[in-house]
């Protein structure tokens, strides 16, 4: 030997150590083994052994940071901060490896996606309460039968392919085999290893190797937060915490720290505290928690735990107050600019937004002193289009922020012409010889509408549509790189701008002057890949367009502000997260945590200078009335039995409260498992409320065996395995199996008879509404979040002999506007079926005057967006919105959370009383 350790690797993941003449079992996936081999070579050069090898690999590991498929060792080297968990598709599609800090701990563990872990037999609710609290802050991951054309995340393959057939029909679960989908995935491992990085561990947004140097200005670095923290007076901080501990109520202490009311009462009973040390020594007697073989361990004592949390939050408030002062300074510049126009800015920090409506406000100020203020549309804007006062003011507001080198959120309510104002702003820049290049990023469903609006409002602008196949985009890149002055505005989608590396690099190299992000709430998650990639596109000026700046919570609102003004917010993001992340105790309700007065007041002060929001009630006197009605549906006896059997015949609230108590005692690993189970249970409960055909009830196993045998006669199944086909069918729902029977002649005879799709509580309610709508000459837009529900509703429309159109995420972008035009032109089409995600944004369906929301959303603003597809400029009739909610089901709880989020939005806007009145009407 030459002194070097020689290690050889085999295809099955084992490796042979030539030095010790030992063939070792595959404790590492092959990819990591390759990395070890490379580390070994480096260690030999350094003269070290195994410790050096582990040290080198550890350093390599720290460079992995993105949640992305790892396709090669070279790709691995380019990344940073290795994930605590990842999946080796090379060994087994269902064998995750858990990395807990050292390579010796890198061992296979059972898959989190196997059927045995989907359901807790003793408590099928699992950790539903924890999931509800989690989903109330952010939307749940999209299940496979849910529609979202822009969604990049989904539930695991094995989870999404499961059905509740065995639970609903009391069938014995079949032994788990790889389904056809899983076998296909196993044979097409082109993406390599899938790394999943917990959001909390993402610390630095390092640019990729080909990123622009400008990316550094968008980093979210711990050192930035430390710079703010270093300015805090520690003595003053401790004094504030001591005051709070001595003055706060029991409920306030529980809300701030997330402790139980009993713990808060115990702490309050020990007051007064002469100093913090007196609070730190408080220790509440608590039961000892068993920890299996590791013995028994107690939690952190009560005093240190509560004082520590209060210190962290109060430190966050100190940093946030410094941010507020900076925002107020910038807001002062904006205010002086508005006053120079001769306008009175009606925005205050208490209202949380700017509201400039019309020129009547100029009367007390006289004529504009600022020559840049315009009172008529820009010269290059189409002369045939008349702009309202509030729209011209919006153009001026955008240009003012542009001149001040700031950024803004144009948050007018849906239907008030944000697209029109944006195009007019581009026209104004053209008049001032600022010709671009500019960029507009929008959902795919709005692409054609943007093109039409550009042609309608400003045909002089040269528009470049960056969209199409990979080959087509390559041609566009070559053409533009050879002539960068060939366009003024580039138009593309969120998916293209944030997915392909070639597309991202191309967009970064364009050096855009203005970047506009339509439906800006797509950027609400600062930890997402989409957010990070779009943040890396440099621009001189950023504008977000959104009718709903607040989607779920204040943390998401801060993410939007951090996106448009990174130089303002990047130093305090960690402190902002502390303040605006809700801590919810088991006894405190969600609404109280969401509407925390201190959090809301600070959010208002930060957002006020940068958000322009006008409401329909302020600017559109002639817009017809919109009436919302919640239609409560009653289960039939059979539907109720199925639902209660699955829900263990217990109250949702009692189960949820019980589980959140249990969750507090969980380890991180158990907590992750509970969240996965809870997400699955939530989806199934929603499906049970929607329609029984979302499960396998009618197609028994004996029928499936006959179908599996018959379908072997189809050309594409000639060489398939009949047993595998049968097993795959076992995991399909009734509607999937029925559609399969309609597709293949060999199994046509197995189609469902007697129209079982009409037998559901929501369908019975829908039938009555549609019958009355047809008699009254009303036209209906019918929304559902789930594509399989739309499949069922298509069958319902046919049974009712109603003409309809359908639009969902799978509809080709080129045909979407044609469907809308067809609905406008043909009044005999009674119903337009739309998925809430794909059809809820940027679409004008003012020719309809009835909106039906078949299922409720965790995010109420998705529903509001859907409503305003019909209730917008151009509507001639009063609009009625019906929302279906099944009594005594999970939907009532989702609706309650939605009401709390709407109340938070109203509080930020100063309209809480109005919302309360509307809720009472409902």
Swiss-Prot record:
It is an enzyme of class 3 (hydrolase). GO terms for molecular function: ATP binding; ATP hydrolysis activity; ATP-dependent H3-H4 histone complex chaperone activity; chromatin binding; damaged DNA binding; DNA binding; helicase activity; histone chaperone activity. InterPro entries: Helicase_ATP-bd, Helicase_C-like, P-loop_NTPase, SNF2-like_sf, SNF2/RAD54-like_C, SNF2_N. A motif (DEGH box) lies at residues 518-521. Keywords: ATP-binding, Chromatin regulator, Chromosome, DNA-binding, Helicase, Hydrolase, Nucleotide-binding, Nucleus, Phosphoprotein. It catalyses: ATP + H2O = ADP + phosphate + H(+). Residues 139-177, 198-224 are annotated as: Disordered. Residues 765-922 form the Helicase C-terminal domain. Disulfide bonds: none annotated. Residues 399-567 form the Helicase ATP-binding domain. ATP binds at residues 412-419. Its EC number is 3.6.4.12. GO terms for cellular component: chromatin; heterochromatin; nucleus. Signal peptide: none annotated. It is found in: Nucleus; Chromosome. Its main location: nucleus. Residues 153-166 have a biased composition (Low complexity). It comes from the Eukaryota. Belongs to the SNF2/RAD54 helicase family. This is ATP-dependent helicase fft3. It comes from Schizosaccharomyces pombe (strain 972 / ATCC 24843). The gene is fft3.
């Amino acid at each position: 030997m030459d002194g070097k350790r020689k290690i050889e690797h085999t295809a099955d993941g084992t490796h042979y150590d030539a030095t010790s003449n030992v063939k070792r079992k595959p404790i590492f996936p092959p990819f990591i083994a390759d990395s070890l081999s490379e580390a070994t070579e480096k260690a030999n050069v350094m003269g070290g052994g195994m410790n050096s090898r582990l040290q080198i690999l550890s350093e390599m590991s720290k460079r992995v940071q993105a949640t992305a498929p790892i396709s090669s060792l070279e790709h691995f080297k380019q990344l940073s901060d290795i994930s605590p968990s990842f999946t080796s598709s090379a060994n087994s599609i269902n064998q995750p490896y858990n990395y807990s800090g050292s390579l010796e701990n890198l061992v296979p563990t059972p898959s989190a996606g196997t059927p045995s872990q989907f359901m807790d037999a003793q408590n099928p609710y699992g950790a539903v309460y924890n999931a509800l609290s989690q989903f109330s802050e952010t939307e749940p991951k999209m299940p496979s039968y849910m529609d979202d054309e822009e969604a990049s995340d989904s539930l695991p393959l094995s989870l999404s392919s499961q059905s509740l057939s065995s639970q609903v029909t009391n069938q014995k679960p079949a032994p788990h085999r790889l389904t056809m989908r899983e076998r296909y995935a196993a044979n097409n491992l082109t993406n390599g290893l899938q790394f999943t990085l917990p959001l909390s561990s993402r610390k630095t947004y390092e640019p990729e190797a080909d990123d622009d140097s400008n990316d550094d200005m968008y980093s979210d670095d711990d050192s930035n937060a430390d710079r703010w923290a270093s300015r805090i007076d520690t003595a003053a901080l401790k004094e504030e915490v001591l005051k709070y501990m001595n003055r706060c109520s029991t409920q306030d202490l529980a809300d701030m720290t997330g402790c139980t009311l009993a713990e808060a009462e115990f702490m309050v009973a020990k007051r007064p505290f002469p100093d913090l040390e007196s609070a730190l020594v408080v220790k509440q007697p608590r039961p000892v928690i068993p920890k299996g073989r590791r013995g028994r361990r107690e939690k952190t004592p009560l005093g240190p735990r509560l004082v520590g949390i209060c210190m962290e939050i109060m430190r966050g408030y100190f940093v946030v107050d410094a941010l507020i002062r900076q925002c107020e300074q910038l807001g002062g510049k904006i205010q002086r600019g508005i006053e120079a126009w001769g306008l009175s800015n009606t925005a205050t920090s208490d209202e949380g937004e700017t509201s400039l409506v019309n020129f009547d406000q100029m009367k007390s100020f006289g004529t504009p002193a600022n020559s840049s203020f315009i009172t008529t549309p820009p010269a290059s804007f189409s002369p045939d289009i008349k702009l309202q006062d509030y729209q011209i003011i919006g153009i001026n507001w955008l240009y003012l922020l542009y001149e001040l080198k700031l950024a803004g959120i144009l948050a007018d309510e849906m239907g008030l012409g944000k697209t029109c104002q944006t195009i007019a702003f581009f026209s104004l820049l053209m008049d001032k010889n600022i010709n671009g290049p500019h960029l507009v990023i929008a959902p795919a469903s709005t692409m054609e509408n943007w093109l039409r609006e550009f042609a309608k409002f400003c045909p002089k602008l040269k528009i470049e549509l960056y969209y199409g196949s990979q080959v087509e985009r390559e041609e566009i890149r070559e053409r533009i790189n050879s002539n960068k002055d060939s366009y003024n505005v580039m138009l593309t989608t969120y998916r293209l701008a944030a997915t392909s590396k070639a597309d991202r690099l191309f967009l970064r190299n364009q050096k855009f002057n203005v970047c506009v992000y339509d439906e800006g709430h797509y950027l609400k998650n600062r930890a997402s890949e989409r957010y990070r990639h779009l943040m890396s596109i440099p621009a001189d000026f950023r504008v977000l367009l959104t009718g709903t700046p607040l989607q779920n919570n204040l943390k998401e609102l801060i993410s939007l502000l951090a996106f448009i003004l990174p130089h303002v917010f990047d130093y305090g993001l960690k402190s902002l997260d502390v303040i605006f992340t809700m801590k919810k105790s088991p006894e405190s309700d969600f609404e109280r945590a969401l509407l925390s007065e201190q959090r809301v007041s600070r959010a208002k002060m930060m957002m006020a200078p940068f958000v322009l929001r006008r409401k329909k009630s302020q600017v559109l006197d002639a817009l017809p009335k919109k009436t919302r009605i919640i239609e409560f549906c009653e289960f039939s006896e059979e539907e109720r039995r199925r639902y209660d059997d699955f829900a263990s015949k217990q109250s949702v609230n009692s189960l949820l409260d019980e589980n959140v108590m249990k969750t507090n005692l969980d380890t991180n690993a158990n907590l992750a498992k509970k969240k996965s189970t809870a997400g699955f249970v939530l989806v199934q409960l929603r499906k049970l409320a929607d329609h029984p055909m979302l499960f396998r009830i009618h197609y028994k196993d004996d029928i499936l065996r006959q179908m599996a045998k018959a379908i072997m006669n189809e050309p594409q199944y000639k060489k398939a395995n009949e047993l595998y086909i049968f097993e795959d069918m076992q995991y399909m729902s009734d509607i999937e199996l029925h559609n399969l029977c309609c597709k293949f002649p060999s199994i046509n005879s197995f189609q469902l008879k007697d129209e079982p799709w009409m037998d559901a509580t929501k369908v019975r309610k829908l039938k009555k509404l549609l019958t009355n709508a047809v008699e009254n000459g009303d036209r209906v837009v019918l929304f559902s979040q789930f594509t399989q529900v739309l499949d069922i509703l298509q069958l319902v429309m046919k049974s009712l002999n109603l003409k309809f159109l359908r639009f969902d995420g799978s509809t080709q972008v080129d045909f979407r506007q044609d469907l809308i035009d067809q609905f406008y032109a043909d009044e005999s089409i009674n119903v337009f079926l739309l998925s809430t995600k794909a059809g809820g944004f940027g679409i004008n369906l003012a020719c309809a005057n009835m909106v039906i929301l078949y299922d409720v959303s965790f995010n109420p603003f998705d529903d509001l967006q859907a409503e305003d597809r019909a209730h917008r400029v151009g509507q001639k009739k009063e609009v009625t919105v019906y929302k279906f909610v099944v009594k005594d089901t999970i939907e009532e709880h989702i609706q309650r959370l939605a009401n709390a989020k709407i109340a938070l939005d109203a509080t930020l806007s100063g309209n809480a009383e109005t919302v309360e009145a509307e809720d009472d009407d409902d």
